[in-house]
Structures are given as structure tokens and as C-alpha cells.
Amino acid sequence: LYGIESHGMQRMVRYHKCIEKGMIHVDAKPEVVFETPVSAVIDGHDGMGQLIGHKAMTLAIEKAKQSGVGIVSVRNSNHYGIAGYYAKMACREGLIGFSCTNSEAIMVPTNGRLAMLGSNPIACAMPAEPYDFFFDASTTVVTRGKLEMYNKAEKPLPEGWALDKDGHPSTNAPDVLANIVAKNGGGIM
């Protein structure tokens, strides 16, 4: 719906599995547990990440409009989709928006064999002329969602994207994904 194939409807199966396993609580009510005029902490109570992320950025925007800056942190949430979506929310209000999150360990550090780091997306958006500035990136070569797309299409991964469980370059999407899930080693570069 937002034009990023790896983060759209393809995620619904994963979310459904997380709901069935009790990892996502569909009835969770995100709650502000700490607040100052310029900051807040929201406990998402393991709810849907997109709903919690939207609430957090909405609150950050309100605080920025009142105080000049708004910083909201979230805990106990789930996958929140596209980091850039939230940064653009602030930009549309004439503000500088910044959004980032952590993720499960899927990246193998340099000279490593085991996935120890998350893809940890980061995004920034700000009003500018003639076009707004927009940056949205992962700290890995590729997102897990993109690996899943290659796997679904039964296509080999491009060279330099992933490592097998022994730390060697791999183009085999099913093996790379299976090793990430099982934490056998390997992952994204």
C-alpha cells in the first residue's frame, strides 16, 4: 500500500503467526508511562507495532508543536513497518521527523558467523525546497522482508547479501532464512 513490497501485505502471515503465538496482543492499549513537556515513554503492552508507532509519532508531533521538540520512546512493541512512514508524518506537519527501531538479530558482524545485530531501520524526513528531504534505510545490506521476497519467488540472492551458517557467502534464500530463524549461524551482511 505504501509502495514497499517487502513491508506490505506480505507481513500479514508473519503478524498472524505472532498473534497466534501470543507475541502480539491485539487488544493491547498503548499507555504513556512517563511524560515531560518534551518527551514521553509509551508502553505498547506487546500490541501491533504500527498502531503504537503512529501513537508515538502523533504525540511527538504534538509536543514539538507546543515545546519546539518532541521525543517519544516506545517499549514492549512489535514490528512497526516502515520507519520512513513515521518520519514523513512529522514532515507533513512542517517538522523534522526522525524514526528508528531495533530488530531481531539477523546481521552477521564483520568476520563473524552468527547473526548478532539487528537491521535496526532509521529514517529522517524534513521540509525542504523544491522537494522534502527523505532518508529511510536499514543498517544491513538488505532487509529480511526482501530475503523473504526472493525466497517466495524462488530466486537466488544477489552475491554479497548473505552468509550461510559457516560464515561463507550464500545466494540460497531458503537456507539463509532457516538459519536466521533457527539461530544456527549465518544471516545478512
Residue ranges of predicted features:
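Acidic/polar, glycine-rich intrinsically disordered N-terminal extensions of enzymes
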Residues: 1-3
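Active-site cofactor/substrate anionic-group-binding motifs, chiefly glycine-
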Residues: 8-61
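Short coil/turn connectors at secondary-structure junctions
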Residues: 36-39, 66-70, 92-96, 118-121, ...
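General beta-strand structural signal in soluble alpha/beta enzymes
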Residues: 42-44, 65, 70-76, 97-101, ...
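Short, amphipathic alpha-helical segments
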Residues: 50-54, 58, 77-84, 114, ...
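A glycine-rich phosphate/pyrophosphate-binding beta-strand-loop-alpha-helix module
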Residues: 54-58, 62-102
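Phosphate/diphosphate-binding glycine-rich loops and adjacent basic-rich segments that engage nucleotide
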Residues: 106-176
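Internal helical hairpin/lid segments
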Residues: 180-189
